[in-house]
Amino acid sequence: MTRMVQCAKLGKEAEGLDFPPLPGELGKRIYESISKEAWQAWLKQQTMLINENRLNMADPRARQYLMKQTEKFFFGEGADTAQGYVPPSA
């Protein structure tokens, strides 16, 4: 049976994640209140941040930056956006 959550990002009930996507308290919080749809949106955003900012994921500072952006994306005022990015129009 599909696990449903009240998604904090999307503001609606949606299919929940199958397992915590990150270790620690943040991973638990995301698992309990973020949907698969919202997690996929974060993965796209994260990829843009890594590429546009040329983050080296072997650098602890880059990983710390992404963890802060993850928390801001789901539970804060929103993550940083890539410089000059214009979302495609529908």
Curated annotation (Swiss-Prot):
This is Probable Fe(2+)-trafficking protein. It comes from the Bacteria. The keyword rRNA-binding does not apply. Keywords: Iron. The keyword Disulfide bond does not apply. InterPro entries: Fe_traffick_prot_YggX, Fe_traffick_prot_YggX_sf. GO terms for biological process: cellular response to oxidative stress. GO terms for molecular function: iron ion binding. Could be a mediator in iron transactions between iron acquisition and iron-requiring processes, such as synthesis and/or repair of Fe-S clusters in biosynthetic enzymes.
